[in-house]
A protein has these predicted regions:
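Short cysteine clusters
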Residues: 68
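Rhodanese-like catalytic fold shared by cysteine-dependent sulfurtransferases
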Residues: 2-24, 32-61, 72-109
């Protein structure tokens, strides 16, 4: 166990793992230029600054996962969506975290 894990604990990805198993609506909230540099296949790019303008895209989705570069913008996006009545949102954190969790699930199944 490394020092960061000891100090801050291990990230609990159980909500992310469950959401990934249910064909989620994947939303990359990074900027278009960041998105163009690579993302998850099938993810939609809705930058954090545009989330409020696209609330209708989130309605009637059973599972929503938002992610970004570090997890900060996706946390803000989750908060914005919840303030607008969208409650089934999981903050996937970083793009790297979502990809690693997807790979873990693929290896388990």
């Amino acid at each position: 166990m490394n020092l960061l894990s000891i100090l801050f604990g291990k990230k609990d990805n159980s909500a992310l793992e469950n959401a990934l198993k249910n064909n989620p609506f994947l939303v990359d909230v990074r900027t278009p230029s960041e998105f163009a540099s690579g993302s998850i296949k099938g993810a939609q790019n809705i930058p954090l600054s545009e989330i409020k303008n696209h609330i209708s895209k989130f309605k009637n989705k059973s599972e929503i996962i938002v992610f970004c570069r570090s997890g900060n913008r996706s946390a803000m996006a989750k908060g914005t969506l919840e303030k607008n009545g969208i409650s089934n949102v999981v903050n996937g954190g970083s793009l790297e975290n979502v990809v690693k969790t997807m790979q873990k699930i693929k290896n388990i199944d």
